Amino acid sequence: RFLFLNYGVVFTDVGMAWEIFSLRFLREVVNDNILPLQAFPNGSPRAPVAGALLIWDKGGEFKDTGHVAIITQLHGNKVRIAEQNVIHTPLPQGQQWTRELEMVVENGGYTLKDTFDDTTILGWMIQTEDTKYSLPQPEIAGELLKISGARLENKGQFDGKWLDEKDPLQNAYVQANGQVINQDPYHYYTITESAEQELIKATNELHLMYLHATDKVLKDDNLLALFDIPKILWPRLRLSWQRRRHHMITGRMDFCMDERGLKVYEYNADSASCHTEAGLILERWAEQGYKGNGFNPAEGLIKELAGAWKHSRARPFVHIMQDNDIEENYHAQFMEQALQQAGFETRILRGLDELGWDAAGQLIDGEGRLVNCVWKTWAWEPAFDQIREVSDREFAAVPIRTGHPQNEVRLIDVLLRPEVLGFEPLWTVIPGNKAILPILWSLFPHHRYLLDTDFT
């Protein structure tokens, strides 16, 4: 709260207070800018300053969680801090600190001493680009990133119908793939909990980096031209970014990971899939045959999606648009369940055949319901192809229809219609395009999560 209210910045999610000391950036809420955050160990030649974060390791009084405080004032050889969960009585009127900690200056270093004798102060964190005396970001040990293969004992667990075909979603999956999760259902892979946390940390940080790169692209025509997006859409793209930067529901980052580290190579920002496989089918597989320790990291995925929809600006009725592809049936149904859990009314549209226009030229479905909010399984690229089919030189605006003699509705007539709120927003085509990778590398050279990439 202190960082947000006083500086308009926040840090990414962490499980425990002591983990804050491993972070190296803050996010500026108003524009998603990434600001450098440096960590200085207790005893550092870099003095603590008012407004800095003070971090304790887990242990003693702060068992398991560690502790975090704000340095509010340097007062002689004392540092005054504000914190929670230590002082449980009201502070004197006008007092803006909870405790005073002794600061010892010796041998060119600054050391803070806690009032508890069983705790360890890790150090302080300052938002600055100056890295002198700062600690490097901790790196996870390579062996903890190893993906390990294992086998279940074959007792015929998957010989029969182990997926419940009476359940519409599971049945849709079976219709597309059969009672199959992979070529050998007895072979599976595991990662360590440390690797899972590293993936979470990397995803959060990279998402902000992709947003930063997207902003740079949309401000530079020369960069935007590299993305092969019809020029007639450029004003729409920029408007989408300005108005709907925080309207994204879901995306999927693809990583390569082994003992050498973790690298991102694609961000499916405008058309993520695999929700059903991760959030349902893998759960059913585990219930059917897995007896070991651990858990499926995606077991709460549908609740997370429902939460994202609850906090979205989607309209009360959402049409779910999918292609006439059997695999997309279960993808659409999984998202429909998330939407319904979030309290939305829904209808799945398979293809575009039932869409048309009413007498006023408004887009309607086969039941006559107005179509004004959609979530799509399609990527944006098929809509771009439709625009490329007609020369954009012939039009001063995107050539969408408000009627047609044969009542034929194209994808662009839905997704690019001004009154239709589409998810994912149009701007997501920028982070979803591989042309973003060289721009990321130019902005964050030698970043540990990036591959060295350039335009050839």
Q: Where on the chain are the PLM-derived regions?
A:
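Hydrophobic beta-strand residues in large extracellular and virion-surface proteins
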Residues: 54, 81, 103, 318-320
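Acidic Ser/Thr/Pro-rich low-complexity disordered segments
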Residues: 11-13, 89-101, 448-454
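...with weaker cross-activation on analogous glycine-rich loops/strands in unrelated enzymes
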Residues: 18-88
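Aromatic- and glycine-rich peptidoglycan recognition patches
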Residues: 63-133
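N-terminal capping segments
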Residues: 1-25
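Short hydrophobic alpha-helical module
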Residues: 5-9, 57, 443-446
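Preference for protein termini
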Residues: 132-456
